[in-house]
């Protein structure tokens, strides 16, 4: 795999959003997609912190393939608001932890992700 190769593609929606007392926002996201061609479903929970006109987010998740393989996900990123509410353009990094030999190569690959920047 080389820089710029597409490892995964996902679509989904926020399943819940909660404002925290310190101005942060907690969100849960559920999605489906393909990881190296394998279908999977995912769930992530994270916290976004306002910072200098942007949002900084950290979240954890788990992806489960149709074959029952699981991949743990840790990701972080920065979002720039693009309109009202929580709409933002996001970019960030991801680290995977796969226990299945089928996805073991993820354990040595840092990844990048983006939303709303096309």
Located regions from the model:
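Beta-strand-enriched cores of mature, soluble protein domains
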Residues: 1-118
């Amino acid at each position: 795999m080389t820089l710029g190769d597409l490892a995964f593609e996902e679509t989904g929606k926020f399943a819940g959003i909660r404002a925290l007392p310190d101005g942060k926002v907690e969100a849960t996201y559920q999605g489906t997609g393909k990881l190296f061609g394998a279908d999977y479903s995912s769930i992530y929970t994270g916290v976004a912190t306002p910072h200098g006109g942007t949002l900084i987010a950290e979240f954890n998740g788990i992806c489960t393939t149709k074959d029952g393989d699981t991949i743990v996900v840790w990701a972080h990123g920065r979002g720039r608001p693009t309109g009202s509410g929580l709409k933002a353009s996001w970019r960030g990094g991801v680290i995977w932890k796969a226990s299945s030999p089928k996805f073991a190569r993820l354990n040595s690959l840092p990844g990048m992700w983006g939303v709303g920047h096309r």
